[in-house]
């Protein structure tokens, strides 16, 4: 069972909240008013997975063995930006409960196993708990009929706004770390080939 449905619902709630802020109205979703508690739960759902995998990547890169080649007793077959990409991909995969890694990363170490297990546990269950609290909060609210200022969640405007919100949150979350790994490697190879 995946977590894509409640992840997308969290982004839909964030979109409704942002739209409500832009027009100065209390945000509503499926006839329920969205309050601060709901937004805290949405933030947990959206931010826990990237924070866990980025924190695990950062902690792993601090260890000297994560900066050395395997021939020198390290965990990487490549150093630099590609080595960083290997570590980032391993934890991204663990956060998605896939468990794959680049062949150049020695993933079967005590640190990687403990960090990976912790990442999998936190990324899977913390958002689930937040979703349960969010569902309880929404279920306990009275239905409010849609007014003239309510953003219809079936409109193309909402879909476009949702896509923009997902792209902005994704870019703000991952663009800095992608600049250190895959993008840096791309531009390095571009410079070498050019």
Residue ranges of each PLM-predicted region?
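Pore domain of cation channels
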Residues: 1-20, 104-138
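Alpha-helical transmembrane segments
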Residues: 21-35, 133-153
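Final/C-terminal transmembrane alpha-helix of multipass membrane proteins
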Residues: 50, 157-179
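Short helix-terminus and kink motifs of transmembrane alpha helices
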Residues: 16, 20, 24-28, 132, ...
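Hydrophobic alpha-helical transmembrane segments
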Residues: 43, 115, 159-163
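Juxtamembrane and boundary regions of transmembrane helices in multi-pass small-molecule transporters
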Residues: 132-143, 169, 177-179, 183-184
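Membrane-embedded translocation segments of transport machinery
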Residues: 1-28, 32, 36, 40, ...
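P-loop potassium selectivity filter motif centered on the GYG triad
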Residues: 1-3, 70-122, 177-194
